[in-house]
Amino acid sequence: MVGYDAKADARSNSKLEVAVAGSVSGFVTRALISPLDVIKIRFQLQLERVCPSDPNAKYHGILQAAKQILQEEGPRAFWKGHVPAQILSIGYGAVQFLAFEELTELLYQANLYQTHQFSAHFVCGGLSAGTATLTVHPVDVLRTRLAAQGEPKIYSNLREAIRTMYRTEGPFVFYKGLTPTVIAIFPYAGLQFSCYRSLKRAYDWIMPPDGKQTGNLKNLLCGCGSGVISKTLTYPLDLFKKRLQVRGFEHARSAFGQVRSYRGLLDLAQQVLQHEGTRGFFKGLSPSLMKAALSTGFMFFWYELFCNLFHCIRREDR
């Protein structure tokens, strides 16, 4: 179960088990959804409309983008930036789930958990994700840069990217986009965790277990649903984050169409509205929703699966 449960003390996992389950969950999920993530980032950074009617648009659909990336850059392009992405996912998963379990236990001990469970999961989910974000944000910037570049590559590998970015843009380059990231991640993760719990309860109400072992399917479906809800409600801030993370990297974006510079978050929002319209705030939403559904579904699925696995191993050792 995700979150503290006083009734399941015998099944509680240790802090190490929680961290490992979160890390493995992040690792497996990232490997599976990386192609969608690359397409999503390309859509978010494209200034032209993502539709076939715009002749200047490089990408105008998920299948078309996948085909074009495959033709121009080869199959490995779908895993561009995968090494920093995996470091990001492993570290993020460990910190997020460990912090979430600890925070929900603290709220329970303060007698604030049982009567406000949706709010408790929202706040704890947001705080745990914020903590994880501050920990791994530099890796997220590296991952975005590596995934965003076309051919010829500006950075041939992770080490060169770190060295070049530090030398040409200074140490603060690794925290570009941090403000919209933190602003976006709190409600996004909060909704992930709170909606996941609510959807699981709704699932049990609609389809009572009746002794059947349907937990894994339930975790996957409810995770997918919570991912779609949370991503839809917070998507514009994710787009802002990606645009700001490649600020100062415009020369590598010239092959993808128009290039525009932004002074900050407010200037970015104004320019998107002025030049791209309200639809500009939702560029890349389709692959993002697909990615959010799969990544959140897999995240909770694998996390609960490994927590249960650790419990079974401990029980057999007794």
UniProtKB/Swiss-Prot annotation:
Source domain of life: Eukaryota
Keyword list, A-Z: Antiport, Membrane, Mitochondrion, Repeat, Transmembrane, Transmembrane helix, Transport
Q: Which SUPFAM superfamilies match?
A: Mitochondrial carrier
Q: Which GO terms describe its molecular function?
A: antiporter activity; thiamine pyrophosphate transmembrane transporter activity; thiamine transmembrane transporter activity
Q: Where are the Solcar repeats?
A: 13-106, 116-202, 214-309
Indicate how the chain sits in the lipid bilayer: Multi-pass membrane protein
Residue spans crossing the bilayer: 19-39, 87-107, 122-142, 173-193, 220-240, 293-313
- Catalyzed chemical reaction(s): thiamine phosphate(out) + thiamine diphosphate(in) = thiamine phosphate(in) + thiamine diphosphate(out)
> One Pfam family name from the record?
Mito_carr
Location(s), subcellular: Mitochondrion membrane
Protein family membership: Belongs to the mitochondrial carrier (TC 2.A.29) family.
Please give the name of this protein.
Mitochondrial thiamine pyrophosphate carrier
